[in-house]
Structures are given as C-alpha cells and as structure tokens.
C-alpha cells in the first residue's frame, strides 16, 4: 500500500480530548488527525497501530511559544538542531523562535531570510519565527509577515541585553501599531500578535544606583531582586494596556513575573474588552526567590524569580484564566557568561534553560495544587498555538489538526541530571530537582520522533510554520488540501470554507451549497458539483461568486484578501518589473468591463504575462450578451479550480 494511503492508529485509555481524559482511538492519515473513535472500535487489518497504551496519558503535542534558539550567529549558545532535539525529548512538537539573541537579530526582512536559510536539515520539531520591533523598523513589519511568514513580533520596553536589539519607546510602539492596524484591515480582521518584554528602565536604574550606594552584596540574590522592582513591570504593563486599548490590536505580555500586574490585565480584558493576553514561565511557577543559593547565578533571569507569595498568586492567575499561557522562555548561554566563579548576580547573563523539562516542571507544581491534568493541554498547547495563529493545525487533540502527541506518565518521577539534557549548554538551576512526570514518546505529524531510552532522535522532519489564514506572497510553502475523507468529516462551516478557499475564492453562495452537498467521492467530483451549483444560482448569486476573484493586473497588496494561489496565478511576485503602462491599461479595461457588465472580468491566467491578457479582455468587451459573458467567466473560474487541484494534490 502507498505510504500516503496508510491510516495509522493511536489507542489509549487516557487520552486528553476537549478538556477530559477518556479512552479513544485516533486515526491519522498523511500526518493529520482524520477521526477520533471509541477505544473499543475495531481496527481494520490494513491500519497501522502506532501506539496502544493503557497506562500512559496521551495529549496533544506541547507548543512552546517563547524559545531563544540563537541561530544563526550565536550557535555556541544554542541552535536549531540542539533546541529541537531537546524539545522533542520533552514532548514539545512546536516551538516559536524569538528574534534575538541570534546574529543578525530578526528585525529586517533581509535578516529574516538569513535565519530561514540557516534552518534546513536541523528541525526535529516544527518551528515558527517571530520578527522583532525596534526603533525605526516599522517599514519592515508588513513584509516580514506577508513575505517572510513571521507569526508575531517581539519588542522590549527596557534594554534587551544586546545592543543590536534596542528597546522601543511609546512613539515607536504607536508607529508599529499603526502598521499592524493597516495590516489587520488588509487581512479582513486577522491580526498578528505584538509581544512585549514589559519592564521600564527608570525604576530599575533608580534601584540599582541605590543598591550601589549601599554597597549591597552582588552575590546575594536579594540584591538582584531589589534591582528589578515589581513597579518596573507594573508601569510597563499599564502602558501596553493603554496602547492596546487605543489601537485594539492583539498584544501579549511575555514572561509575566509581577503578580501586582495581574489585576490590571484582568480588568482590561473583562471590563474593557482589550485584546491582550499574558504568559508566565516554568521558572516563575516553580522557583522562589527565598530558595536561591548565595552566588548561584544560574537562577538569574529578567524579570526575576520572585517571592513564594508572588508564585502562589501567579498560579492563582493561571487557574482563573487571567494568565492563560505557560512557556519556557528558554534562554541559554555559554557557562562563562553566567560568571559562576564570581557569583555576581548583577553582572551575569540573565536567562534560564528549561526547554526539555516543561511538562514535568509544571505538573510537579500543578499536581500539588489540585490543578486537573487535562488543563495542562490548554496552558501548554492550545493557548500558545492560538497566540501565534497556528491553532488550525496545532494544539490539543482535534480532527483536522496535525497528529502531534506527547505520551507520558504523570505518576513517574525522575531527578534532573545534566546527562539527560539535550540542549547545547546543560547548566541549569533544575539540576538535582526531583520532578513528577516522564515523557515516553513524542509524535510529530504521525511520526515517532522520540522514545524514552532512545537519545538519538533520528528523524529530522520538522517544518517552518506560517499562518495559513494570512494569504501572502508565493515564497510561502505551497498550501495543501486535506484528504477528501477529512474534508467530508469537517463539521464546522468555517473550517470547510478555509479548505475549499484553495480551490474557489471565498463566495458564500457556492461555499454554503457545497457544504450541504457532502460527502464527495473525490475533489474532482466536488468541482463538478460546484459547476452544477453555479449553473443553478440566480444572477445575483452568480455575480457574488465571480466578484470574489481579484481583478487582473491589480497590485500585490490588493490581492492579499484573496487566496495565495490566486496571488501566484496572477504573477504578482513579478509586478515590480512590469511596465506601468500595462498595469494602467489593465486597470482602465477592468473599469470598462465592470461598467458594462456589472461584474469582474475573470480569465484563466495561470502565470501568463499580463500583456497577453490585454487582447483577451479587449475581445471580451466586444461581447454584448451579459448572460453569455457571465457564464463564460464562471466557466473560466471552474477551469482555474481544476488547475489548482492538480497543483494541490
């Protein structure tokens, strides 16, 4: 049997689905979950049983939306291969890479391309990329999204730790938000998140100068803690809330440390409808400042690990939903930068390495607090994937999503040892900690990429991820159709529409009718059915269907509400080299055509030069039969869908 036609099965007595733990059989085809059946359902002889487990818990693969991979340029700190290997061994199937501390930093389209070029052959798990917002780079934002495929942006309100990634001020943020608002409008309301390291400099500077005057001991953790007061976070978060409320674009507070800011975030979201979210990290939910040993700079990070009372309040915010994301903020460095011998918290590099250990770290603490195990899937899979617009493919176990799983034992414990860690720099404050929860298997798109006891992780099948719902420039990976079986099984109209949007531009009269005509035996039958539906529509609906297509010869920005396939078919990537007189001629002819017939001109272009379209359009203008012209345009639309189908299957 062709490997693409093989259906794999994962069976478990303890499967986390829709916030519950229950028995289930999960069917997988081409790396996608195509069905979820009862555990007792019969397995067909031709099916391949990948996992059958009675004791272990099966959850959707973890999504860590805050990881510093540091490649290219600082691969002695970390790199794609070591970071994704560590992720795989920890049940993490998707990671989102921060725009620093790589060199160059990812603040321009050119630098982004440099990062992308460093990725092939090194990804054990799937990876999405963030861009950076710094003073003066707002002109790069749209291109990094629409051509580069970043899934969000990160900026600092305080010095980032490296000079090439300067922090932003209010005017810089507003300038960037103006671009983000325009981008959101062009994408039909879909937005890309702006993430903020929320500390401001003034309280930190004042506290540090006071501590210096007092000759405070830099080896005492309390000295460092006092140098990063909560008020620095609180003021910064208030400012982000203010700007988010003003501009109403999606924002996110990374690594929230100060429990003082929780109430402001809660009120902004629940009282004012501000589209802001917040995350906290493994180390803030596990460590306490009181336990940090004298001079042990492995515990240093910014913002700092705070008091036990603060930790309890962070957990309360997690369980009540104010903080809905838990991430690693994996930020490694070489041991020399930690100044271990000097033990100087004030001068050592700030950052904690924990990518591989997230599930047991959080379960160790969550289990003590009575947090249901199934909630971990929301905190560590669903919410992070939603943050970066990948929840159509990533997150908890759901039909239509990638077949990504972590299979683990929540009752088994282990002691952290450097020999277990797969990151490049293995020094960690978790060394020697006894944690609850052991990962036994990690599955990526239906492929086993890690098993306990096998430290090789031989498969390199990770991919770079982009947001499929933001249709853009053709340097993106080609879009793909789900199997016809999966399409038939979709129960949500919106998901169905998103799929057939690759064949037909979004037009409700056609999409609604097709949804009601399921199941289809093949995509060819679906297209044939679409043609029959179109022929039966009234004139108004026919015009709505044909007007869903972009105009021939429009600029790249005007195609962005249409599908990415439409973008390629019209050769928009070559627009910059086209004679402007040709585009002007096409614009005039389009206007004449629409004025005469009352709908858009549609022709099967498929990459032909635009100058070859002009005589076709001129000839069609000579047609005086509106109905004949309308039917001709719709027939061309069907030919377009047939051509697309050949490319997509």
From Swiss-Prot:
Its EC number is 3.5.2.5. One of its GO terms (biological process) is purine nucleobase catabolic process. PROSITE patterns: DIHYDROOROTASE_1. It holds the Pfam family OHCU_decarbox. Zn(2+) 2 binds at residues 154, 197, 255. Zn(2+) 1 binds at residues 66, 68, 154, 329. Its cofactor is Zn(2+). It comes from the Eukaryota. Carboxylation allows a single lysine to coordinate two zinc ions. Binds 2 Zn(2+) ions per subunit. Gene3D superfamilies: Metal-dependent hydrolases, Oxo-4-hydroxy-4-carboxy-5-ureidoimidazoline decarboxylase. The modification N6-carboxylysine is found at residue 154. Pathway: Nitrogen metabolism; (S)-allantoin degradation; allantoate from (S)-allantoin: step 1/1. Belongs to the metallo-dependent hydrolases superfamily. Allantoinase family. This is Probable allantoinase 1. The gene is allB1.
